[in-house]
Structures are given as structure tokens and as C-alpha cells.
Regions:
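Acidic, metal/ion-coordinating pockets
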Residues: 1-279
Length: 279
């Protein structure tokens, strides 16, 4: 298992990785192995709430600041899933720690990203607790975020990759200024499509009539029609007025993905070594 962990880290280095949030599974080999591993890589390990109980200091840097095309992006790491078997490390309240770090970096950066390792129940309050963040990426739950899922209108937006890395979240942000909110146009477009499908299904039953004539006297359906049309119009207005935008999609890591031959060779060799070690 320690070999597996080390080659996963080598794989991250090969494909490119800006930071690793230390959570539940990073402690799979024990705290000593984690610290040794963190010292062998150029990838920053981050955590804003894991404390060395012997020194009462943070175990890792709480965040990193990444610069991309003139933008400064703060990435803050948090967890509340520290294994009980870990003795010399404690996890301080991750909400309190997260808010403290947001306050510390918000005037220094353009975008704040939270990496949060927490169970599903604790993830439900993250957008309310971290309102000054822009993006929240979670682990620790098998839930998968889809574009149509409800999100706060102006963020922060929360995304989860689901079970066993079967998908990868891809989030593209276009930032034209630093004052307007970031608008999730993927949600607005998905909402429009969903409401249009409802109208189309109703229309298919009576193709030669208007919806008003077809469902005359059926108050519930007429109300649904009105709500769907209003939602489509409102989404269209928001799309046209959006200045800073976010596009989100899940990419399935299936056979349609074309393998990078160098990475494929590395993975195949590593798996073969793992199998040899098992035997």
C-alpha cells in the first residue's frame, strides 16, 4: 500500500498537480509515512486545520496562492475526517479554520478555492459557511455534482466528483473584472433545457394546439407551463447579463478517453509491481 501511495504521487507529478489537501486517505499509511511522503515531492501538501499536538503548530501550510494569467488564486485545504488511529495530530474545527483563512487571504487574491474533505452531512452547510469563497471542491462523499443541481445564484459553487474517481470535475472560469459575481452559466443552460423539455412533452400530446388551449381548465398544468416559461426567460436574461462566467462539466474517465502513452506505460509498470509485491 505504501508503494501504491508513492506511485500515485509520482503520477500526480507527471500529469501536473498544484496542491494536495490532506484528508482521511492520506493517513492510510500512518502519520510518519505521510510526513515522509510529503517531503519527497514538489507538490504542496496543504491543511488549514491539522495540528501537530507536540508543537501545537499546523502540520502543513494552510493554503497556497497560484498565479494564472495575471490572476491570483488561493487554495485552502480542510478536513474533518482525521482517522481515530492518528495519535499525534488533531483536527481543529474545519469551519472555524476555513473562515479564518478566507479572512486572511481575501484581500490578496482574486479567487478563493476551498478543498474540503468531509462527510456528506457536513458538506451541506459549506456554501453558507464559506460565503466569501468562490469554489468549493469536496471529497469524503460518493455524491456527484451535476450541472442541473441547485447552487447559490452567485456562489460559492460546490462540486463533488462522486464515487471512485469515475469522473473528473472540469471548471472553466472567465473573469473579465474583479467586482461582478461569477455566474454559473452551466446551471442556467441546464435549467433552460430542463424546462424546455417539460414544455415540449406537454406540446407533443397536442401538436396542433397552443398549450393554453390544450390544457384549458387544468390549473396545475397551466401553472407549470407559466413557471417553466418564466424560468426560461429569467435564465436567458441572466446569461445575457453575465460578465464573469463559470462553465462546469463532469468528464467520465472511461474508454473514450485517449490514453497518454507515457502515463499509460507508467501506470502499467506500477500495477505490475504492485501485483508482484502482493505475491
Amino acid at each position: 500500500e505504501k508503494y501504491r501511495a508513492s506511485v500515485i504521487l509520482m503520477g500526480y507529478e507527471q500529469i501536473g498537480c498544484d496542491a494536495i489537501n490532506v484528508g482521511q486517505y492520506e493517513f492510510g499509511g500512518g502519520e510518519e509515512f505521510l510526513l515522509e511522503t510529503a517531503g519527497t515531492t514538489q507538490i504542496p501538501f496543504i491543511s488549514a486545520n491539522l495540528i501537530n499536538t507536540q508543537t501545537n503548530q499546523l502540520l502543513f501550510n494552510p493554503y497556497i496562492i497560484i498565479e494564472r494569467e495575471g490572476l491570483k488564486i488561493a487554495v485552502i485545504g480542510l478536513t474533518n475526517l482525521l482517522p481515530k488511529t492518528i495519535k499525534n495530530i488533531r483536527a481543529d474545527n474545519f469551519i472555524t479554520a476555513g473562515k479564518s483563512m478566507i479572512k486572511k487571504v481575501k484581500d490578496k487574491v482574486d479567487i478563493i478555492v476551498m478543498l474540503v474533505n468531509a462527510n456528506r452531512a457536513d458538506q451541506k452547510t459549506l456554501t453558507k459557511e464559506f460565503q466569501e469563497a468562490n469554489l468549493i471542491f469536496t471529497s469524503g462523499s460518493t455524491s456527484l455534482t451535476r450541472p442541473m443541481m441547485n447552487q447559490p445564484e452567485k456562489g460559492p459553487y460546490l462540486f463533488s466528483t462522486g464515487r471512485e474517481s469515475r469522473y473528473i470535475n472540469v471548471t472553466d472560469i472567465s473573469l473579465k473584472n474583479k467586482t461582478d459575481p461569477i455566474i454559473n452559466i452551466s446551471f442556467l443552460e441546464a435549467s433552460q433545457q430542463y424546462n424546455q423539455r417539460k414544455l415540449d412533452r406537454l406540446q407533443d400530446t397536442f401538436p396542433d394546439q397552443t398549450l393554453e388551449d390544450a390544457y384549458k381548465g387544468q390549473g396545475n398544468i397551466l401553472s407549470l407551463i407559466e413557471k417553466s416559461r418564466t424560468s426560461i426567460i429569467q435564465a436567458d436574461v441572466q446569461l445575457k447579463e453575465a460578465v464573469n462566467t463559470l462553465i462546469f462539466k463532469n468528464v467520465a474517465l472511461d474508454s473514450k478517453i485517449i490514453d497518454d502513452q507515457e502515463v499509460l506505460e507508467f501506470v502499467s509498470t506500477s500495477l505490475a509491481t504492485c501485483n508482484q509485491l502482493k505475491n
